[in-house]
Curated annotation (Swiss-Prot):
The species this protein was found in: Arabidopsis thaliana
Record's signal peptide: 1-27
Record keywords: Endosome, Golgi apparatus, Ion transport, Membrane, Signal, Transmembrane, Transmembrane helix, Transport
UniProt protein name: Transmembrane 9 superfamily member 7
PANTHER family: TRANSMEMBRANE 9 SUPERFAMILY MEMBER 2, TRANSMEMBRANE 9 SUPERFAMILY PROTEIN
Gene Ontology annotations for the cellular component aspect, listed alphabetically: cytoplasm; endosome; endosome membrane; Golgi apparatus; Golgi membrane; Golgi trans cisterna; nucleus; plant-type vacuole
């Protein structure tokens, strides 16, 4: 039996939905590194990463605090994304032997001076967490969930210390976590004698260690030795942080066999328990899309069938003059807007951001940008932004040529430099603030130079290549002729005033994404993993459709009011959703974050301005192209003498 077109479509639609369902229901990813097999007794080297805090958002090098240092500190080779995230991966004194439990090992003994005491206390006040890595797995603290269930969750890193008071005293003291109890989970290969690491947990403790006589080569502690089985007892005295005090850093390690396979070892870190919220968000957004789709369908039916057929049947000039609405402005609707060059720049930049976002999400859906590939997401976004410059140049030049613009080189330079120039200016100010705080989040000179090389050496030339290709193409022709004398725009009702209609237009696109936005902001500012790109991709598609449809609907109402200045209005209508995004970021700052430092607050709002600006350019471009297609469609269907 011959397969029909309809059945073919249903087959491919089913295939697509099956793939999306799999992507949504599973933490689907490709591990970023090849598995390593360990034999019993093989050395395991723990690496240390940055100190991080959700209260300050300022990462610091692990050895900024007076922790135990190896004889020579070696920096791990970091990719571009890791450097931009503030990661500083280095070697440490913590070494294990595979499958060999070690009850107590002494790391070092340090004496606190004024500076180190001050630094420890500041980091305890700001709730800093120390981060470590073993076989590319970050260390985590196992916690009971707060919802009362028996399930557990992972907290990334461990607290530097805590504040408390002795029994019978109200004076608050600072205590440091100087003893780390590590637990390494492994999965044994049944065919060979090797094992693979599938988990890395830590339980931090504060212990005031005691010893009779300190032997640097073989220190013997009375509170901790190789025969100790249970270190932590009810009467253990915690280690206080005070100038002049000695701190002995110790650790122990145990190994536990796990049923988790190496390919699934990241699942516990990526465990998401909010699927119902995401589905509710998507269903809610789809209802908005269906409502808007109905309106667009009615408009298209009316304009392309009823109105156009009636309009084409008009024979006398008197009948034509009696017509009102969008048909009357056909001689002005394609008149180039004010600041047409600037509009071309923003549309070209929006295409660049759209291409970067789409390809990044496709790579993430396929599993190439998993958290195990540390810094991969950030690196991919930067590189894709650079290579999408060719589409920015092409889009802006095509529009510029249609507007009969001149000085194409100036136009191309604006496309290449305006948006990234504004971003770099804000970025430089923020980076200077981070430098002033001596944070490892400050971008080093070498990385900054590499970013400039990517911008000037690859992105700018590609914008010129795209612009050259665009200008070589014949100009886009208007479906109707433009009158020499502009038509006067009649007085508009209050609800069609530009400010009101633009602000109204941004509500629905923002409403389509704001629940997913909460999870994205949480992952950025509360140091959590975000890896539900299946949901994000669906929300992105809904955002595209919502921006397009709301712009088309409001553009139609505008043309019916005989206002033909739709070019910038279309861009700003969808782009105004960024205004609500920034308002939401203010709400999020005051309700979800505990940032108290001025510098940290400036960093937050600086980065949110960058995100909101990029969102404005992206959504504005989507709305503009939808309206551009709509206007050309309806006026190309009308016969004009």
């Amino acid at each position: 039996m011959k397969k029909t077109k309809g059945s073919s479509f249903r087959f491919y639609a089913t295939l697509l939905l099956s793939f999306l369902s799999f992507s949504l229901s599973r933490a689907f990813y490709l591990p970023g590194v090849a598995p390593r097999d360990f034999q019993k007794g093989d050395p395991l080297y723990v690496k240390v990463n940055k100190l991080s805090s959700t209260k300050t958002q300022l990462p610091y090098d692990y050895y900024y605090l007076n922790y135990c240092k190896p004889p020579k500190i070696l920096n791990n080779a970091e990719n571009l994304g890791e450097v931009l995230r503030g990661d500083r991966i280095e070697n440490s004194v913590y070494t294990f032997q595979m499958l060999e439990d070690q009850p107590c090992k002494v790391g070092c003994r340090v004496k606190l001076n004024a500076d180190s005491t001050k630094n420890f206390k500041e980091k305890i006040d700001d709730e800093y967490r120390a981060n470590m890595i073993l076989d590319n797995l970050p260390v985590a603290v196992l916690r009971q969930r707060r919802d009362g269930s028996q399930s557990t969750t992972y907290e990334h890193g461990f607290r530097v210390g805590f504040k408390g008071s002795y029994e019978g005293s109200k004076e608050e003291k600072y205590f440091i976590h100087n003893h780390l109890s590590f637990r390494v989970m492994y999965h044994r290969d049944q065919e060979s004698d090797s094992a693979r690491i599938v988990g890395f947990e830590v339980t931090p403790n504060s212990i005031l260690h005691e010893y009779k006589e300190w032997d640097e080569k073989n220190p013997q502690l009375t509170t901790c030795n190789k025969d100790t089985k249970n270190l932590i007892q009810g009467n253990t005295v915690p280690q206080e942080v005070e100038q002049g005090k000695e701190i002995v850093f110790t650790y122990d390690v145990s190994f536990k066999e796990s049923e988790i396979k190496w390919a699934s070892r990241w699942d516990t870190y990526l465990l998401m328990n909010d699927d119902q919220i995401h589905w509710f968000s998507i269903i809610n957004s789809l209802m908005i899309v269906l409502f808007l789709s109905g309106m667009v369908a009615m408009i298209m039916m009316r304009t392309l069938y009823k109105d156009i057929s009636n309009y084409n049947q008009l024979e006398t000039q008197d009948e034509a003059q009696e017509e009102t609405g969008w048909k009357l402005v056909h001689g002005d609707v394609f008149r180039p807007p004010v600041n047409s060059g600037l509009l071309c720049v923003y549309v070209g930049t929006g295409v660049q951001i759209f291409g970067m976002s789409l390809v990044t999400m496709m790579f993430a859906l396929l599993g190439f940008l998993s958290p195990s590939n540390r810094g991969g997401l950030m690196t991919a976004m930067v590189l894709l932004w650079v290579f999408m410059g060719i589409f920015a140049g092409y889009s802006s030049s095509r529009l510029h040529k249609m507007f009969k613009g001149n000085k194409w080189k100036r136009m191309t330079l604006k496309t290449a430099f305006m948006f990234p120039g504004i971003l770099f200016a804000i970025f430089f100010v923020l980076n200077a603030l981070i430098w002033g705080e001596q944070s490892s989040g400050a971008i080093p000179f070498g990385t900054m130079f590499a970013l400039f090389c990517l911008w000037f050496g690859i992105s700018v030339p590609l914008v010129f290549v795209g612009s050259y290709l665009g200008y070589k193409k014949p100009a886009i022709e208007d479906p109707v002729k433009t009158n020499k004398i502009p038509r006067q725009v009649p007085e508009q009702p209050w609800y069609m005033k530009p400010v009101f209609s633009i602000l109204i237009g941004g509500i629905l696109p923002f409403g389509a994404v704001f629940i997913e936005l909460f999870f994205i902001l949480t992952s950025i500012w509360l140091n959590q993993f975000y890896y539900i790109f299946g949901f994000l991709f669906i929300v992105f598609l809904i955002l595209i459709v919502t921006c397009a449809e709301i712009t088309v609907v409001l553009c139609y109402f505008q043309l019916c009011s005989e206002d033909y200045n739709w070019w910038w209005r279309a861009y700003l209508t969808a782009g105004s959703s960024a205004f609500y995004l920034f308002l939401y970021s203010i709400f999020y700052f005051f309700t979800k974050l505990e940032i108290t430092k001025l510098v940290s607050g400036m960093l937050y709002f600086g980065y949110m301005i960058i995100i909101s600006y990029a969102f404005f350019v992206l959504t504005g471009t989507i709305g503009f192209y939808a309206c551009f297609w709509f206007v050309r469609k309806i006026y190309s269907s009308v016969k004009i003498d």
